[in-house]
Regions:
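Noncatalytic, beta-rich nucleic-acid-contacting surfaces in large DNA/RNA-processing enzymes
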Residues: 2-267
């Protein structure tokens, strides 16, 4: 797991076997799931080349006296919103893929709040919900999946978009405790989820029955939960991605030469 870092209060070798990699980097001899089960604190530190693109663009512009990053709020910039809504985002972090550019064009909003939603709903297992999101975004009628979910998913037009939505629905509809609901969220992101998912499914269906939810509705809601299979974002993750995307889109919209030079230099 190349991006995983384990943090311990004293030397890590006191807690787990350690070996040195060929490049001299110390590695624990447990895989990531075993490390978590063993009580070690594991965080993922992944590199993001787009941060270097933004850094180099800003440095070049500040050197020329054309820009200052102090108090910079790209989310409020109309030119940036226009570029995003038209899909003119090649070179911009996370929103340059064909799928994201097409979604930007269909959405046509270009605002930060919707980009946060779009950054999460674009996940592979949720493709079927993207057209429905666009329809509802443009004023299409919709109803809550169940009366018990009114005001739970209003922000996302009644669709489950973030990992937290799975937990919130499980609490509101099936009477899960918050720890049980978070356990379901975690299981959905694991490769070996089938080993425990059956128990969560049975508990979810049982809780829904006890609250009077029809089996057909429960099936629909569970199917939407399954769209979080393996790859999905929590809202803070999606918001942080959207923030970087907007910074890149701002620089491209206002300073395309310096921005693209930084993109090429960091390939």
């Amino acid at each position: 797991h190349p991006g995983g870092v384990v943090i311990t209060p004293d030397p890590v070798c006191n807690h787990v076997p350690v070996e040195n990699a060929a490049k001299g980097v110390p590695l624990i001899q447990w895989e990531k799931d075993g490390a978590e089960k063993g009580g070690l604190v594991k965080i993922d530190l992944l590199g993001n080349r787009s941060l270097a693109v933004i850094r180099d663009s800003v440095a070049a512009l500040e050197k020329k006296g054309r820009f200052t990053a102090s108090g910079w709020e790209p989310e409020d910039d109309q030119k940036t919103k226009g570029s995003v809504s038209c899909g003119r985002t090649m070179g911009c972090f996370y929103i340059e893929s064909p799928a994201m550019r097409l979604l930007q064009k269909k959405a046509g909003t270009g605002n930060f709040e919707q980009l946060v939603i779009q950054s999460s709903i674009i996940r592979p297992a949720a493709n079927e919900f993207v057209p429905e999101y666009v329809r509802r975004l443009h004023g299409g009628t919709w109803e809550a999946l169940n009366p018990g979910l009114e005001n739970v998913l209003d922000e996302t037009f009644g669709l489950m978009v973030y990992q937290e939505d799975v937990s919130r629905v499980a609490v509101a509809l099936a009477g899960f405790s918050h720890s049980e609901a978070d356990g379901l969220r975690k299981v959905l992101s694991k490769k070996d989820r089938e080993l425990r998912l059956r128990d969560y499914r049975d508990a979810f269906y049982k809780g829904c029955r006890e609250k009077g939810v029809e089996c057909r509705e429960t099936d629909r809601i569970w199917a939407m939960m399954m769209s979080f299979d393996g790859y999905s974002f929590c809202k803070p993750h999606s918001a942080s991605y959207a923030r970087v995307s907007f910074q890149a889109a701002y620089l491209k919209a206002h300073f395309p030469a310096e921005f693209m030079a930084a993109v090429i230099s960091n390939r």
